[in-house]
Structure formats: structure tokens, C-alpha cells
């Protein structure tokens, strides 16, 4: 719908007759149908009479339907139970026989003060997401500073399961191996490991001469795990792990949904349906880890 100022401009210019209809429409950036509709409706009226008529007219579009109170209570309850976003909550309620769009869910959450608004609008990414087909085919790992300590996360690429994590005073190869050993003993041995060129994972060459492998590289080699290195200065390669770091920090420091990393990891793996998985079945990373396991790997 055009603003009051533009409508007044259309009517005034059409009445004066100095410009053609096409020129007026181009100046006001109005379509042909919009131009003639406003001319028919407001022809001969002054700015103040147009404002008065607009104030008395009904807003365009269908009137919004009132959301039943039981639906509103169900939305708030799901949010408190699962900490999920509007799309996942809408899917959950549809499974329970409550038909409600994710837009209405978002509106209810926003009115209840349960939406964490972004300080800056994020632009759509231009690259295409990639992922492995089977669980244990590829794990990603990285370090991040969190509350004065170093946090490491190991993520299964296919299922988005957080296979291991640890919080340490320093980011070292030994601590990386410790967390990886625990993850392997719990979930199994991956075929490949994706890391950056960080010193904890890779011994870079010095002055053009090849360096000897560090402890992490030797551990991967001894366990038959293929080491895949991300491109230099390209954090998107390990973007899934970076996203997990953001999730942990946001849920603890901004939204205050949880108080510890362990709580966030349990919620991510066992409770929250992941939007990159089978959302129609509200699949969690733990469920996807079992479903995507290769038949030769299953016990």
C-alpha cells in the first residue's frame, strides 16, 4: 500500500495535468492498477481529506484470526520444554493435532518476550551446504575461547551429533587427543577427521621445510583415521562446528536457557529436532546418528 504522501502526490499531479499518467506512476513507483485505484478513490480530495478517509478505511487484507488460548498456552509450554524455534514448535504441535503456522508461533513467542532479536540482519549465504551420507564417515573439530577457557567440540558431519567436547585451560594436541579418545570409546571410530591448520591439529612447515607430525596427527595415523585439512582462511569449511560454538554461547550467555555446556550438549543431541535432518519426523541428532549408520558399521 502507498503512503499518504505518495497518494496525495498522485492525486495532485493527476489533477494538475502537467504530467502523463505514466510519468506520475514512475515518479511514485506505483503500478498501473494501484495508480488508477487511488485516482478513482481520492480524485478531487485535498491532503487532509485523503488522510481522514484513510484513517476511516479498513486495513487491507483479511482480518487476522484470533489464536485460541489453548494454542497459545501450548506454544509457550513447548518453548519452555524444548527451547526450540518457531518452525520446530509448529511441527511438534501439528504432530499433536494443533494446526498452527510457524508465523503465528513466532508472533506468540515475540509477544511473550521469548524471542532473542538479532542486533543485525543476517544476509543469506551464497554457498551450498554439504554433508556426508553416513555416520562416522567424517567428524569435524575445532577450538573456541569460552568464558576464559578453551572449548573443543567434535561433531559428526552426517547426523550433527556432538560426539565429544571438553573445556580446558589451554588448547593443546594432548587435550584434543583426550576428547577424541573419549568420543571414539562412546560412539566408535570415524573414517576421517576434518580440522583446520591450527597447531593443535597440524604441524605446519617452517621456512619451506616439512615439519614432523605432531601428537594429534600421529594419533590419527595410528588409528587409521584419514586427516582432512580445511582450506586456509576459510572458516566455512568447519562451519557446522562454528555453528555449534555459537549455539552454546548464545544458549548460555544471551538466552540463559542453560547454565553449563553439558546441558546444551544433552539438549542438542537428545531433545532438539535438527532442521537439517528429517524435520517431518522431528528427528534429533542422536536418532539420526543411528539411522545414518552404515549397515556394515551397525552392531
Question: Model-derived features: where do they sit?
Answer:
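Short, amphipathic alpha-helical "recognition" segments used to contact nucleic acids or chromatin
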Residues: 1-19, 72-82
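Mobile genetic element proteins and their domesticated derivatives, centered on retroelements
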Residues: 10, 35-38, 75, 89, ...
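Short alpha-helical "recognition helix" segments of helix-turn-helix
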Residues: 21-28, 89
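Short, basic interhelical loop/turn and adjoining N-cap
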Residues: 26-37, 94-104
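Mobile-element integrase/transposase regions
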Residues: 99, 103-162, 169, 173-191, ...
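RNase H-like two-metal-ion nuclease catalytic core shared by retroviral integrases
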Residues: 195-197, 206-250
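C-terminal domain-tail junction helix/linker
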Residues: 246-299
Amino acid at each position: 500500500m502507498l503512503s499518504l504522501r505518495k497518494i496525495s502526490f498522485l492525486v495532485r499531479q493527476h489533477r494538475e495535468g502537467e504530467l502523463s499518467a505514466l510519468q506520475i506512476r514512475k515518479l511514485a513507483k506505483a503500478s498501473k492498477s494501484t495508480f488508477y485505484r487511488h485516482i478513482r478513490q481520492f480524485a478531487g480530495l485535498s491532503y487532509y481529506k485523503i488522510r481522514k478517509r484513510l484513517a476511516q478505511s479498513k486495513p487491507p487484507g483479511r482480518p487476522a484470526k484470533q489464536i485460541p488460548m489453548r494454542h497459545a498456552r501450548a506454544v509457550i509450554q513447548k518453548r519452555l520444554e524444548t527451547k526450540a524455534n518457531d518452525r520446530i514448535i509448529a511441527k511438534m504441535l501439528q504432530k499433536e493435532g494443533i494446526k498452527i503456522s510457524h508465523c503465528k508461533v513466532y508472533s506468540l513467542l515475540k509477544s511473550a518476550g521469548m524471542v532473542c532479536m538479532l542486533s543485525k540482519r543476517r544476509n543469506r549465504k551464497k554457498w551450498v551446504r554439504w554433508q556426508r551420507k553416513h555416520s562416522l564417515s567424517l567428524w569435524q573439530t575445532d577450538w573456541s575461547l569460552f568464558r576464559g577457557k578453551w572449548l573443543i567440540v567434535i561433531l559428526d558431519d552426517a547426523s550433527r551429533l556432538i560426539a565429544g567436547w571438553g573445556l580446558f585451560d589451554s588448547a593443546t594436541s594432548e587435550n584434543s587427543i583426550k576428547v577424541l579418545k573419549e568420543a571414539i570409546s562412546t560412539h566408535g571410530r570415524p573414517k576421517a577427521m576434518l580440522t583446520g591448520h591450527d597447531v593443535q591439529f597440524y604441524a605446519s612447515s617452517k621456512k619451506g621445510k616439512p615439519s614432523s607430525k605432531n601428537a594429534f596427527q600421529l594419533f590419527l595415523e595410528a588409528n587409521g583415521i584419514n586427516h582432512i585439512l580445511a582450506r586456509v582462511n576459510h572458516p566455512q569449511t568447519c562451519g557446522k562446528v562454528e555453528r555449534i560454538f555459537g549455539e552454546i554461547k548464545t544458549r548460555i550467555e544471551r538466552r540463559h536457557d542453560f547454565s553449563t555446556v553439558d546441558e546444551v550438549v544433552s539438549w542438542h543431541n537428545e531433545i532438539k529436532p535438527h532442521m537439517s535432518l528429517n524435520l517431518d519426523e522431528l528427528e534429533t541428532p542422536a536418532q539420526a546418528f543411528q539411522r545414518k549408520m552404515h549397515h556394515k558399521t551397525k552392531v
